[in-house]
Amino acid sequence: MSTAQAVKIGIAEMEVVIAPNVIRTCGLGSCVGVVIYDAGKAVAGMAHVMLPHSSMARGGVINAAKYADTAVEALVQLVIAAGGRKGMLKAKLAGGAQMFSFSTVGGDMMRIGARNVEEVKKQLERLHIPVVAEDVGGHSGRTIEFNPQTGVLSIRTAAQEIKEI
């Protein structure tokens, strides 16, 4: 009997797992699922990022997992605290869809999915963490699950077969 658990994270949450546990999130539309992992230690973290910049926050307390500019570094720290090695970390991304069609009204502000992906990649580059695989953009929502033992990110998109990256 397996003792593996599937840890589920919601919107604007992040968590870390160690194999044999897996981690998953659903409802990735314009949000981005960021996975940072150390394959050699079989440890991984996932964040469900909702918005690109913490400057969009209202009020005094910022939920680091909600924003791309704060979630990536916070997730790296959690993975390292769980045994990940800074120089061995890699990233996989999914999400960042354009879920609705907008006219030119709003312009760049309405491209939340693309802006989320851009900011996540910017933060990963700043921290020297390579993106080794991604499934981003498009117009469909996604559910993802990462297995730190195999390093496989499984992606389920509406009306499509499960993709593994």
From Swiss-Prot:
Function of the protein: Probably deamidates glutamine residues to glutamate on methyl-accepting chemotaxis receptors (MCPs), playing an important role in chemotaxis.
Pfam families recorded: CheD
Alphabetized InterPro entries for the sequence: CheD-like_sf (IPR038592), Chemorcpt_Glu_NH3ase_CheD (IPR005659), Cytotoxic_necrot_fac-like_cat (IPR011324)
Family statement drawn from the similarity comment of this UniProt entry: Belongs to the CheD family.
Keywords annotated in UniProt: Chemotaxis, Hydrolase
MF terms in GO: protein-glutamine glutaminase activity
Catalytic activity: L-glutaminyl-[protein] + H2O = L-glutamyl-[protein] + NH4(+)
Keyword field contains Magnesium: no
A GO biological-process term: chemotaxis
SUPFAM superfamilies: CNF1/YfiH-like putative cysteine hydrolases
Gene expressing this chain: cheD
EC number: 3.5.1.44
Protein name: Probable chemoreceptor glutamine deamidase CheD
Source species: Geobacillus kaustophilus (strain HTA426)
